[in-house]
Amino acid sequence: MNLRYLSYLLYIVLMITGVNAYAAETLEPVAKKGQVIVIYRGPCPSGKTKAAMRKIEKIISYERKNSPVSYSSSPGNWEDGQVGAVDLHASQSAMEKAFAWQESDKKWSKMYDDVAKIC
């Protein structure tokens, strides 16, 4: 009985090791060559993170409808209490164009400031 138990245990360990090795070999990079990832993070008191996240989601929705530069953005809520977003831009140039639009768009700037006020 003990030999059978040890055989099963060894089989499970080998299988888990194989699955982990396979997962490591098949993970795809988050960004392709030339793309740029931008992470926005800021501290936010625990009682205010939900309100801040709702506002960040509204900013992302506004960006999708109004930005002249297309990019992907997802809200982020980190375990250490920080909130923000992760953006994926097609290139350095596209990121700079998005930043220029954000700086010049009064509504976007106000929404961004509102998140800072919440936190």
Describe each PLM feature range.
Residues 8-17:
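Bacterial N-terminal signal peptides
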Residues 1-2, 15-16, 22:
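Intrinsic-disorder-linked linear interaction elements in eukaryotic regulatory proteins
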Residues 1-9:
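Bacterial N-terminal signal peptides that target proteins for export
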Residues 22-110, 116-119:
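Short S/T/G/P-rich N-terminal loop/turn motif that feeds into the first structured element of a domain
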